[in-house]
C-alpha cells in the first residue's frame, strides 16, 4: 500500500473530531510515519492498525481496557522490555482507547522517545474500524477520467466520448428528467474494494455543468438539492461514438467492458446521429444493465429461442422428407 505523506499529524488532524482523539505525549513525533517497507508489504489496512501486538510493532497500536489491564499486571522488568521492543521500531503512534488513562510509565516513555500517544473515550474496536476505513480510503488506487458522471435510476453511469459529441448536453437532458449529477468534465474515481469503485467530483467543480453556448450552470441552484449527488458507485460506462465509427457493432454478441483501476466495468456504445433521443437510449441501457445484474440477458434469451426454433424447424423438415 502507498502511504506517501501520511504522518501521525495528518492522521490526527483528519480523525480527531470523529473519534475524539486527544494528543497527550510525544508531540515531537508529529512527522512520524509508517515504515516504507512495512507499508509496501501490507495487503490491506488491517495490517496497519490493530490491538496491541508485539509481533507487529510497526503498525498503529490500539490499547483498550484488556490491553491496559494486561500491561498493569506485568512486573516492572517485563514492562520495560516489552515497551522497549515496541518503541524501538517506531510505530506511527499509540492510542489508549475505552476512556482509559495511560499508565504514567508508558506516557513517560512515549515522551522521551517522541512517540505520539493519543487517548480517546471511544471503544478500541470502533477506533480500529474507523482508522482501517480511513487508511483504506487514502491508500486506495485512484484515477481522474474525462466525462459526465450521473446517478441514473440509482446506478452510477459515466458518459464518455470525443469532444463535441454532446456529453454535457445529454447530461443536462438526463438531469431535467429527474436524474442526478455527480461530476462533469473531470471525475475522481477511487477503488475502495475488490469490486467497488466510487466516483466523486473535484471540489473546484462541485455542482457545475459546462454546456456549449450556455457556459457554466450551477445545477444545484437551478434544479435544487435533489439534482446533485456527492458520490456514486460506478456500474456502467456509456461510450458515445460518431455515426461513421467503423468499430461500432449493431448487435454485439459479447458483453463489452472498460478496465478502470483493474476492475472491468460494463460498457455500452451509443451512436450519435441527428434525430436520436440519446437520453431515452441511455435510460434504456441502464434499465437493461439492471436486468443483466439480476441474471436476465435479453440477447441470450432471444438467441436461445432462435436456436430452439431452428432446431424445431430442422426436425419438422426431416420428418417431412421421411413421409
From Swiss-Prot:
Catalytic residue positions: 146, 167, 185, 250
Record InterPro entries: HPr(Ser)_kin/Pase, Hpr_kin/Pase_C, Hpr_kin/Pase_Hpr_N, P-loop_NTPase, Ser_kin/Pase_Hpr-like_N_sf
Location of region: Important for the catalytic mechanism of both phosphorylation and dephosphorylation: 209-218
Domain of life (superkingdom): Bacteria
UniProt catalytic activity: [HPr protein]-L-serine + ATP = [HPr protein]-O-phospho-L-serine + ADP + H(+); [HPr protein]-O-phospho-L-serine + phosphate + H(+) = [HPr protein]-L-serine + diphosphate
Similarity comment: Belongs to the HPrK/P family.
Subunit structure: Homohexamer.
HAMAP family (alphabetical): HPr_kinase
Record-given protein name: HPr kinase/phosphorylase
Gene from which the chain derives: hprK
